[in-house]
Amino acid sequence: LDALRALGREHAKTHPNALKERTAAVSPDDLAILVYTSGTTGKPKGAMHAHKGLVYTVRGYNTLIARDDNDECMCFLPLCHIAERMGGEYFSLYTGAKLNFVENPETVPENVREIAPTVFTAVPRVWEKFYSGVMIALKEASATQQAAYAWAIGVGQRVADLVLAGKEVPAGLRLQFRIARALVLDNVRKLIGIHRSRFLVTGAAPISPELVRWYLA
C-alpha cells in the first residue's frame, strides 16, 4: 500500500490536474459498473448501474446508517454482488470507514471476533450460524451458567418486545437489563464479535422474526 501511495504521489507531480480532468469527463448518467445477476431464474444478465444511482443510494443509506472514519466494517460477501459493492466497498469510500477483508469464507466467525466491526452487514444464514455457535457453547456450559443465560436473555427479550412495540421500558426492567448485560449478554456479544457494533444489517433473504428478537435482546 505504501508503494502504491508513492506511485500516486509521483503521478500527481507530473499530472496535477488528472483527477479534475477525469471527473469532468464523466457525467452522472454514465455507466459506473456492470453487475451480473445470479442466474437462478435464467441466464445471468448484466445490470447497468450509473454513477448517479450509486451515489444516490449511498447517500440515502448513510442517512439511515450513518458511518464515519471511526467505523470498521467487514467485506466477506463476493464483490460481484451489488450488496457488497454498495454496503461495503462504496459506502466505505463515501464515509471513510475502514473496510476489512476476511481471509477466506471459512474464517468469517474468527475474523468477526478479531475485528469487532462497528457496522456489520450479513445474510440471514450468517446470523443463524452465529446463533448456533452460541447455542453449542451454551450446551457445554455449567448449569449455573445456563440458568444465568436463560434469565438474562428473558430480560433482554422483554425489553426488545417493548422497544419494537414503541412502548416505554419501565425503570425496574431497565435496571435488570443493565445487570443482564454486565453479567451475561455482553459476553455473548463478545463471543460473536459484535460487542462494538452500532448497526447490524441483514438482507438478501427472509430472516426469522424470532432470530431478530434474539439479537435485539
Name every feature range the model reports, one short phrase each:
Residues 20-23, 109, 189:
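Short hydrophobic/charged patches on amphipathic alpha-helices used for structural packing
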Residues 32-58:
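Conserved AMP-binding A3 loop
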